[in-house]
């Protein structure tokens, strides 16, 4: 392949990963196979290539739709190449085997090749040569249109630059191949006689282009094909070839159905093959082209002789074979060749299925639904049925009966979805007799009897094999069930007295069932009696195919068998197929018979009349069925289906008119010959009247027609009865039927009002009409319509009467008269039992008894169902019924249940492997539904008898009721039917369990919710079983009903939320989906939402804090009236919130970010609980936890939100404070009250391990300390008021001070520690020690809490070492010794109290204490002085000595409230970026000599270091970063060992270029949220100082580049960046020995031309040199990088000065004195650039002042053209050339720099003549630069620190790198200023810019000059706590 498309070119989002991976593998495999096939094809290995292509086409991906968006383009390309090359391979194979093939075979193979090519062209049609090949092949075999289409694709191909049309219009040159294509297109158009196209201008143009061109020659690649041999023979010759052929119809069963099926299969097999004579494909399955088979023979064969229909049968070519040979076409194997017949019971007459046996086709179209819909789809009843015997019969009677009994049974019905044998009895084998069955276990009967026996109710045991002593209907029921067939199922399912669910059906159709009298169910009916023997004898005679069909039709339809005898539905379908293809000939023959003068026999005419009438009736029946189907299912059909229906309806109507005309013609001929055809004429009129009802004609007109027909019937044939047994939609023709139709039409208007869908609007009128019809006592009472309806009802069926009664009772129920409705249903139910127990029933014949029994059971099913539903919804209705009546009804229910136990036993004994009748599944489901309804109604009666509705039921009654429900449910569930009847029994059981609240009913509840809702939940003792029930959706009422049981299971094990099982959590989620949230439209809920919303946005005032801590705060909530109050009272929402919190915590423990969705869900759940139960402090505590976790999550991953005023962090923390305070407030209010839900209180105390007081203390401490600094206590803005003097702004609330917040924390911690309910907690002591430190408590109190924390703390928590309290002890002791609060000896004694103490045993005080720990270890840092943080790095600022004078707090600031007005930074200790400007009039403070360390102090400090190292070793996960940081602090502050301190801090920092973050430390578990970013700030500031001390330019520049974009990883990013820039630039100047103010000394002496020449020379020298970058060049690159990164972010003055200095130093080293050689006219005093004169003295403030330039010197000259000539060099000129130098040397700098600083920079002569390479400055030099520190301020002074420190930032403007010449000239004109004045103005501007920095950075930028002119840097930080 020329190109390869990657498999992952398209991303498939809709496919699963597995499916996508499978496709990719298939594509890869297909490509490999195709390459192998192509290789074999090229080498001529055709067989191997065919095999490979076959394997290729078996891959699924080849056959996918190329338009699928999920399909890779590679598939389309592979598919195109595969089909194209496979077609070419077939063409090559045809060329090699051409001599061995016949003409037909060659044509067939060419067709197959074209099919392959067409499949390829469907994918890609852009290959012109391929289209030309396709066109040539198509034209050869005569497919001219296809050939033309291919050529037109070439002509109009869009892949060409210019189409043929454009080329012709432009008169462009066409090559010979293109001309040949045009010639063929024109030629084909002429051959096809497409004159329309030929007359078009384009064809004229093409014809003119090819007019003089010679015809194209035949392509060489197909020259071996002769097109003349593929010319198709004419139709006439084709017909002749078929004459003399013979068709053998093989029949497996000697019956009419077998004959018709054999004929159909033979012809179907004949036309199934594509390859027939001479390549002609016969598409008409019945050869309607006129070809006749002259001889048709019938042949009886055995089943085994019938060949597989899939065997290939080739037709023989008559050219190669003799014509006299026959053509044998064998049929498919008949599905019904072996007829399985049910045993026909002697009691049931065949007549029962009259008018029903041929309903199969109609049922398939209509699909009528049963009254009781199937509730359990997986109940396993699919193959349940009685045992049957298999016999093969040879008579038509049995064959016909089988079809009547097994209508449309699917062939696979006997093997699909079989149910395993019942657990009660084992399944019986197919050959095992029923007599060998095991006896039925009477346990179920005994259990029920033990409960109902005390009420004198009987439920004796009944056995299927011992029913002789029972009532007659028991024996009848056994006979019906034992010999159950389709006639019984159909009868039972059809007998339903329930009202029609679809009342939109025309009333005439509803009343049709009423016209059928009850005797129709039991009337005898014959089966097909026409014997096929005579026809089979004639099969040996030769006849044509049409004659063969006519003989079948005449034999079957030439009499009245179709209307009076039951036919198999398959036979009727076959006859209709034959008639569909014979009706043109029949109609033509009848018409010819009428018009020609030939004399036909009377028998032939009468026979034709019978056939025509039968066909007319078949079409009429189909039209009626179609009318009803369209009426019922219109809403369920698509527009396309409706159009098809309309077309079908139109076709049927045309066919009906044709046959009606035929029947009328034949009737007239018969009357002319005086033939007796009265019956046929009456049949025709009756069917026509039935059709008129479907046309919705006027009722009066229809009634008149029926009355006229009644007169005609009385006159001509009063005793005539035509059953129409095979026409389910045509009523029986008899005088009674006519009378019934007339009565129906008389009362149609009356019943239309009853059955109308609008009848419910006037329920009173409907009741009155039904009462008049049903309850009329005399014939004269009522109006005329009522009398007519009453008369009609006397002859109507019992089912119809019951239907009217149901309508009346339902109307009572809907109108509120439920009591009357119940009485009516009870009377109906009582009458049903009397009907079975009377002597009249026993005296009936078996057929009548069975019919009445099934009808009674069907009616009882509807009656009991309605009673159970009404009484369950309204239990009080049974109270008005007498106890005796209830007892009678209960016994009646038990009697019917005993009867249904006969069915159960038979059902349990079935063999699932045996076939079952078609409708057995639906019938068995109806029996089981009946049983469910009976048990439901019986329980309601039994409960009424036991007074089960009383409020205070004894335990024995509750136990009895619960046990009955449990036993019955187990029995019903065993048969997978407990959820039948819309789950009425399961719903009743659930209601009773919830109502009675029995302690031992939990198992029953679990089983019921499993069956009803599909909820799979188990307890410790019971696991519900699968009853095969189909669950329904859980509703709100259901969830509220049994949520108490679920909550009890939750409260059972309250040790942890994680102990709640996963299935229980899933159930709670389902319950929440059903219950939902409180309704916001309810007044109480809406009010509480408003109160809660206002409360959570209120500020946290000191007044509210005090009231809450005293329990005196109240919120105006209302008592909820929401229906979900019961769930909330049970703790449902509260527990859900706890689960959501636990889920979030679990995600955090997995070292992954928690899902905020869980926290939001927790807030929602707790809010719902507060809306319903606002006084539950557990929910307030939970929602406070959720808000605090949201705050922590926002501060976990980014510091961005710390600098945003009124951010979501502050909002969530404020809500957490408010809710936490209210939780404590409610707890204090309820401390003496008994909890409303003790289980929830116990669960809450067990789950929420943390005390509320401890949580509140942590919440206040986190909100008060850094980095938040009390932002959540501040308001977003101030209030604006209008007073007497105008508008003014102030805060009207008293906000808490920092000291007050710390006092709240101390009080909460003290309560938590002293609480007896909570065990001692190490964190409480730990946090209180920190608060004591903030509140300036005594050292003994602080140490006491730390030591208690160590004593209580465990060694490990969750597998990790606990180091916090131990580190706290070391850090505080170090701080106390440094501040002089403890002596070294005292601190050393206290240090021994930590178990991690390691004693230092060295004797030398000067011993090095460097640590050789692994540099790759991950460690952290600590700085715990939040309260003293005043400057930008105040948390890292501590006094340098204990003797520092204290600062007296100002009275004005002490105790001042936190206010936005106090946002101005308060003067604090000197920091690293603080500008130290010493007043010129005040002398500098003399340096204090540091006191040497004593041996005890050295031992103490060294022991601290060893102890901290011990902690580092114990920290296996390297998460704790504060011990290494404290070690580094001790090295720096005590021993002044900067390199050891640096080695301790190096593992924290990423000094490699691969990492983007400058520092990397982990957050320990007990570290406050957001504190992590403060530590990053402290460590960076500290490490920058260490790098400056050790002259590490490489590390400081690397960190500087990473620091610029690290603004979201720390606090005060701008200050760290400014400090880093300042320190790095000072360091670069120092290591290169650049004197101060070098530019001021050099730039005035530079001449521009000379400077420009030297700068260019320096650049050329460096760029041309092959040596690596020099040290100065590398530093210049780093300085320029700092300048670039700082551009637009901060002030660039210092960085610009460094770049200028470094570049000037490079020029000096390069040019020496020549740099100033041409500047003699500008200065009277020469400037010396070498030796010691170039260096400045250490003590000097500035370099020696240069002589003033000569007054006569000019700054600029003029060129010849008059323009000014630039002579002066500015800083911008130097910056521009330095930038150009860096760009020119880009290959040597950047990533290519190899900067080595271990040996330091090159030695530079100092002022005293010595040189130094040391990387670390001396201690004495550092002491001169260290400022004195201020002591720690008190908490009162720091109250103002809670003012907002995060305000807007004002960015400084940035100077451009270069300006235009005009700006430079204007700058040069300022010659009156000296260089010193310019420098002073520049620094003044920078100071102004620094003062404009935002207050959010806490201090202005730290740039000033000291007394000695050097920028000082403070390295001191506060000691960690």
UniProtKB/Swiss-Prot annotation:
Q: Where is the composition biased (Polar residues)?
A: 413-422, 1899-1910
Q: Does the keyword DNA-binding apply?
A: no
Q: Which InterPro entries match?
A: Hir3/CABIN1 (IPR033053)
Keywords (alphabetical) are: Chromosome partition, Nucleus, Transcription, Transcription regulation
Q: Where located?
A: Nucleus
Show the ranges annotated as biased composition (Acidic residues): 1402-1425
**Out of the domains of life, which is the source?**
Eukaryota
Compositionally biased residues, Basic and acidic residues: 353-376, 391-400, 428-439, 1757-1769, 1819-1836, 1861-1890
Among the record's GO biological process terms, what is one? chromatin organization
Function noted in UniProt:
Has a role in a nucleosome assembly pathway that is required for the integrity of heterochromatin and proper chromosome segregation.
Q: Which protein is depicted?
A: Histone transcription regulator 3 homolog
> What organism does this protein naturally occur in?
Yarrowia lipolytica (strain CLIB 122 / E 150)
